Amino acid sequence: MDWSKAKTIIIIALLVTNLLMGGFYLSGYREDLQQRRLAADSAVRYAEQRGVSVSAELPVDQKKLPVLFVSFNYDGGGEVHTHKGLPVEASGDLDAEILPESEGDTDGLLIAASKALVKLIDGFEGSVPQGLDIEKVSLVYWVDTSLSSESALEDTAIPAWKFESGGNRYYIEAFAE
């Protein structure tokens, strides 16, 4: 066998191997996506069993995000800034502009919106507000102002799932345990 035939055989073998590996990867991705959709449907059924209506579509994408270090500008209005396409928000009535400064060193895996919905419902400990209807679900960077003083200059924003219902906002930390 000469060298050119050997090279051709090796190239064909590598191409076939790449095609097989790509097919296995896509198959696994589709299965994972289907499982996340089933988990979202299951979480909606769980919510409805607990008396919570879910009219919003639960996101099924899986992300990794870092924490975000922010500073507060008390002279500015309540302008909402974004970081990586996600709004940076604070719980409560913070009368300051939240300015993204820098990211943490490592990206953390986030829980699915379906798991966050179950955590939200379980957090009510059996006293779910009457007529609770989840109208919107979104991923945000969240500053929990209940843990810091009103005159703080800096804080940490974490990825969180925000659930909106009739003007009320509920935040569930999105980092996996």
Task: Please name every model-derived segment.
Residues 159-164, 172-177:
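Conserved histidines in hydrophobic membrane contexts and catalytic metal-binding motifs
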Residues 2, 75-78, 108-115, 171:
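General structural signal for secondary-structure boundaries
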Residues 143, 167, 176:
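A broadly conserved detector of short glycine/acidic/proline-rich loop/turn motifs that flank catalytic sites
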Residues 97-99, 168-173:
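Short, surface-exposed beta-strand/loop "edge" segments at domain boundaries and coil↔beta transitions
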Residues 63, 84, 89-151, 156:
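Charged, low-complexity helical/coil segments in non-catalytic cytosolic or luminal regions
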Residues 1-102:
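Preferential activation on post-signal-peptide N-terminal prodomains/segments
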Residues 20, 138-140, 164:
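Residues in well-ordered beta-strands of folded domains
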